[in-house]
Structures are given as C-alpha cells and as structure tokens.
Amino acid sequence: MSKVKMISPAVPNVPWQDKPEGHTGAPVWRYSENPIIGRNPVEGVARIFNSAVMPYGDEFIGVFRGEQVNGIPYIYLGRSKDAIHWDFDKNKIQFVDEEGKPFMPIYAYDPRLVKVEDTYYIIWCQDFYGAAIGIAKTKDFKTFTRIENPFLPFNRNAVLFPRKVHGNFMMLSRPSDSGHTPFGDIFVSESPDMVFWGKHRHVMGKSSEWWESLKIGGGAAPIETSEGWLLFYHGVSGTCNGYVYSIGGAILDIDNPSIVKYRCENFLLTPEEWYE
C-alpha cells in the first residue's frame, strides 16, 4: 500500500495528545485524562456512553446513549467547545414525524451522527418488532424528524457514509436477531432518498482471529482516503465472562464499498482500563 492521504475534510480544533513515551503496539492510544464524561452527568440518567461527535459551527455537538434510572435507553444531546468538557440537555431528544407530530421510539441506543451535504443524520437501534434501525434528520439540532422504519427487523449497527456514492446514500448494517446475537456480518445498502433501501451486498464477516471470531459490526462513519474508505468496526469474541468488544480496521473500495481491499489482522484497541 502506498502512503495513504486523507480526502475527508480535517476536523478543525480536534483535541490531540501526542503518543505517550514508550508506547508500543497499535498505532492508536488513549487520552490520558479518560474518561472525559462521568457516569451520570444528567439528572434521571444512570449511565451515559456510546457517543457520536462532530464539529458544528464553532463548537462540537454529540449524541449520546443515556440509560434512564428505569433502565430504558434514549438519545441525549451534548455540546462542547473543545470536545472534552461537555454540557448536556436535560431532556432526551424529542423526535417528530414529517408533519411535526411527536414520533418517539420505545427506546433508542447506540447512536451514530453523520453529515451528508447540508443535513445531519442520527442513526440508532430502536424497537420495531425487535431490534431495528432508526434514522432521523436535522439541520439545526432543534427539530429532529424521523424517517419511518427504513429497514425490516432485525438489524442494527447502521453506519451512514459521509457522502453519496454514484448519486446514492450508502449505509452499512448488521442483520441479526433481536437479542445479543451470537452472529453477524456487515452488509452495505444504498438509497436515492434515505427512505427506500436496496442493492444489499455483503461486505465482510467474522474471521478466524479470536478477537473477532463471534461477530462484527460497523463503528464510526467511514473516512475517505486515497486508498478507499477507512472503516473502524467492532469485533466480538466470546469468553466465560461474556462478550469482549475490540476495535478493528479495514479499507473498502471507494466506488464499491462492498469490496474489502485491506483488513487488519489484529485489533487496534481492546478493553484494558477500568472504565472499559
């Protein structure tokens, strides 16, 4: 592989910490002041995690999974000047339908946040006769309009590409069952309008490597590079103490993201700290 160059626009004022002295192994490292957000920074929320963050104007904006004190997860909005110190809205995001009427999911968790052209999209897992993909759009982070049930159940881990490919929206997902499924591969689908999805293609599945021998699923939005779409994804292994989730990497073809050009043999990050 030749030297890879970024094509996706750089994130302005992104917080950065140089590689720790003596660091070896994977080419990524943890921020030394982790965790940057406490367990329950919002009243009535027992745990907040699984964030999706991006720049918005002169600040950063994020959507977060917040598990309420009754255990039901919803999506909460947060704002930050530096992506490290966060202020959260006290109330969960209020979704509406195309007519502006309330359209709230029974639950919502594991959000992703992606901007395509002039619109921001939130993608999450919701209930639609089991685990299913939820999508909403906004331009001002004040009004959040849901797109009704874009995929059949059971599906989750939806990841939207940050630009159209051949004029269509592209999305990764992981069809599965309705529980903590012990299986799952990554697929890619396309749509002309974010409503009707088709041309479903298989991207990749689990491997013989132990860290991703059970199932895999999409992570953050793909990053466009000179070699293709850089995808960070999660791989899962099963242990006698439960599932272990690690981060892997792959590069997908720029014009046909169902083609995997490169894939990491080893994980990039795996749980090591107390907060993980």
Tell where the protein language model's regions lie, with residue ranges.
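Beta-rich carbohydrate-recognition and catalytic domains
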Residues: 1-106, 114-214, 223-276
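Catalytic core of Fe(II)/2-oxoglutarate
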Residues: 220
